[in-house]
């Protein structure tokens, strides 16, 4: 990243979401999880694999040593085959940080930021698009954590009962990241 892009980032206007925008992103993620029919705890990486299977979109994860002044994760949309993405994430960071970067990039894909314009790169993302992707990442991270906790509790009490609605943890507003 050169100095020009860093200055452009500083000049980019701040996006302040309103309540309806927040609810729309929450609903989009909740509906997706419900439609995917997930009934077990998944890591972010497993969720990416399930998303690929559910949508027919190929999302490949690649761990690489990226320059320190670079992104922690970046998505490339491939032109062939159609609907194929490569999420490359920083190898030299913690597992949690890698998962958050992957979830952020998945948030861009879920929100359709690469579908609206061909050749969109990260420098072209608006502050609103970055907020949507970051909020998706926070929701997905919270969902995997809360669902894992809920399943651990129910497994001890009733080991044979499957979770009926895996999107239930997203309805709670307490304990958000």
Segments from the language model and where they lie:
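Active-site hotspot residues in diverse enzymes, especially metal/ion-binding acidic/histidine motifs
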Residues: 1-177
């Amino acid at each position: 990243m050169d100095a020009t892009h860093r200055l452009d980032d500083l000049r980019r206007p701040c996006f302040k979401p309103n309540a309806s925008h927040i609810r729309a992103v929450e609903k989009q993620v909740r509906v997706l999880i419900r439609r995917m029919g997930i009934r077990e705890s998944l890591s972010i990486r497993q969720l990416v694999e399930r998303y690929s299977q559910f949508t027919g979109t190929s999302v490949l994860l690649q761990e690489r040593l990226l320059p320190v002044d670079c992104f922690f994760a970046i998505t490339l949309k491939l032109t062939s085959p159609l609907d194929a993405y490569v999420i490359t994430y920083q190898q030299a960071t913690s597992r949690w940080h890698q998962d958050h970067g992957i979830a952020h990039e998945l948030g861009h894909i879920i929100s359709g930021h690469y579908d609206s314009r061909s050749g969109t790169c990260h420098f072209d993302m608006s502050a609103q698009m970055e907020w949507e992707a970051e909020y998706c990442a926070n929701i997905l991270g919270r969902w995997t954590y809360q669902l894992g906790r809920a399943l651990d509790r129910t497994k001890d009490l009733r080991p044979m009962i499957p979770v009926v609605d895996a999107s239930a943890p997203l309805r709670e507003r307490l304990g958000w990241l």
